[in-house]
Amino acid sequence: MCIRDRCQSLDDPQGTDDSLSECFMCNPVDMLQRAWERCVRASKREGILGSSTALAAILRGDELRIANMGDCVLFLIRDGKLIFRSAEQQHSFNYPLQLGMMDATVESVMLSRALCMHRSGRIPAGAHDMDLPDVNDSMSDYIHMYDRVPSHDDVPYDTPQHDAGHWEVKVLPDDLVLVASDGLFDNLFDDEIMDTVHDVFSHFASSDLEAMQMYAPTLISERLCRLARSVMDDPRVMCSPFQQHANEEGMYYVGGKSDDVTVLAGLIAEQQRPCPL
């Protein structure tokens, strides 16, 4: 949403140099903060409880700007070597930082139920969050304390502005950027991930750059998803990253960890060379 809002004027032939500069300077932490604030406003009107981890990366020139809330991870791989790995953001083992809609207190649960019972309508398709109808006037006294975006002083919330990990990394053409959820890193060790990347690239001739750009990222993401799923589903697996971390915390755990798995892969391309991704 931040990118869309900041760059929408670029489609206008009357766009200014200021608009171009603002788009180029877009910060992923600010992007996550603005998106989260919008979600908070919309969720309070809907009475929705929930939370999510998030990792955002923006490529500007030769600089990759990264912001992370939680246990997603970004790899930057160059010439077959892992040169950067973003750090997970955790409160404690298996308790990542998250972007929450509301805190899980009795008051917020009661509020969400009340909002659901007193809504005058559902969110219309394509509506903007600031245009959504509020709850009935009969509920206004009860919810006035919640009718704002929470600040960092509100203890139950993690916020991108104050809590996100953020990095700026220089990239080169043909670098591989790999972004994945904890479902991958809880089930595959970094060495196993790198072995998979090497194996996929080994099937492409060094002279066939176009084919590598076109197919390698998809093959890598699909294969990693399948491997992570196989660890989850195989009762014979004797060790996984999640098991190792659990054991280090004094917990008994064997095998992989069931979870959803999301893997995105992309190759950095020179601006003058068309990139199929």
Model-inferred region functions:
Residues 4-277:
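PP2C/PPM-type serine/threonine phosphatase catalytic domain
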